[in-house]
């Protein structure tokens, strides 16, 4: 009897990766009825619903999320084995990466040309946004995350420490002066995060040996880190900015560091997170190693 399990895994993965039955059929050079029939057979065989279907989108069930992790592990191992016996030890296939907008643009994107040049059979799909993505629902292999990690189901590798500093443009200071103490920030226009990153509006300081927090308040807020940084550069307000953006701008004279003697750093870091598969594919493992090596000595900490 023909064993169709591997084919069903491949079709299921294609539906998830291409976000739908029609797109999966196109990618597989097959038909939409074949894809639908294969998924129905798979669900009957497993005795579980894997995909919620409606007219607008498809969403994995909890069972579907677990099965996808298994499919990725098995199919990734198969790809690695085929490459090995073909005399090709280099990774191949799609690599889906997510990163915050500013950090991804400023730090991850410049690393990709060398990575791709030395691994020509890998195709990188890079998604940049400040929202926390669900790796399974968004079909992401590796996500770069800044700050504390909250999803204990994911595995993580620390890339480097993450610190933020309070800054303002020289033009802002010329008009409004520099706050001499954290308490004085109440009289200043502080740029605010909106949405999933609103916790960053609580700025920590150390005053007379005790930790205090200032809640940022001002006339501009955004869910986008690059837009906040852009308004800070243009003299709109004061911002608590990640060092990868702030330190180079300070050295160039575009920003001025404020309240340095009161800084109280959070115990936070930048991590590469990935699904808890027992065996990572070669391309995912190599990319995480590549990031870890690149950020072992953070490039923004070095003098220009």
Label each region the model flagged.
Residues 43-60:
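A short LG(V/I)-centered, amphipathic sequence patch enriched
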Residues 92-155:
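Central regulatory/effector-binding core of bacterial HTH transcription factors
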Residues 55-58, 65, 76-98:
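Short helix-loop hinge/linker segments at domain boundaries
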Residues 149-270, 297-304:
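C-terminal regulatory
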Residues 14-29:
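Short helix-boundary/capping micro-motifs
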Residues 1-2, 69, 121, 247-248, ...:
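C-terminal effector-binding regulatory domain of bacterial HTH transcription factors
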Residues 42-43, 255:
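Conserved amphipathic alpha-helical core elements
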Residues 9-12, 24-25, 61:
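Hydrophobic two-helix hairpin corresponding to the core of helix-turn-helix DNA-binding domains
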């Amino acid at each position: 009897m023909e064993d169709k399990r591997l084919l069903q895994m491949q079709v299921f993965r294609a539906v998830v990766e291409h976000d739908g039955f029609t797109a999966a059929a196109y990618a597989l050079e097959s038909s939409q009825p074949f894809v639908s029939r294969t998924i129905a057979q798979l669900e009957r065989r497993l005795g579980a619903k894997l995909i919620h279907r409606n007219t607008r989108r498809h969403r994995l069930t909890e069972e579907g999320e677990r099965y996808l992790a298994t499919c990725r592990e098995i199919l990734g191992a198969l790809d690695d084995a085929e490459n090995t016996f073909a005399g090709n030890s280099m990774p191949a296939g799609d690599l889906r990466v997510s990163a915050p907008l500013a950090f991804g643009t400023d730090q991850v994107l410049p690393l990709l040309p060398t990575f791709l040049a030395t691994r020509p059979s890998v195709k990188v799909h890079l998604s940049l946004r400040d929202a926390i993505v669900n790796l399974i629902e968004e079909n992401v292999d590796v996500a770069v995350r800044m700050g504390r990690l909250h999803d204990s189901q994911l595995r993580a590798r620390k890339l480097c420490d993450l610190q933020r500093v309070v800054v303002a443009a020289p033009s802002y200071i010329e008009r409004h002066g520099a706050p001499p103490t954290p308490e004085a920030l109440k009289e200043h226009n502080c740029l605010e995060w909106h949405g999933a990153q609103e916790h960053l509006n609580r700025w920590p300081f150390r005053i007379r040996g005790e930790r205090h927090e200032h809640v940022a308040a001002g006339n501009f807020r955004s869910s986008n880190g690059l837009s906040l940084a852009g308004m800070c550069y243009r003299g709109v307000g004061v911002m608590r900015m990640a060092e990868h953006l702030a330190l180079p701008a300070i050295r160039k004279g575009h920003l001025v560091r404020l309240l340095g003697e009161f800084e109280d750093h959070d115990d936070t870091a930048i991590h590469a997170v990935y699904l808890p598969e027992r065996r990572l594919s070669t391309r995912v493992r190599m990319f995480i190693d590549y990031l870890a090596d690149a950020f072992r000595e953070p490039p923004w900490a070095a003098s220009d």
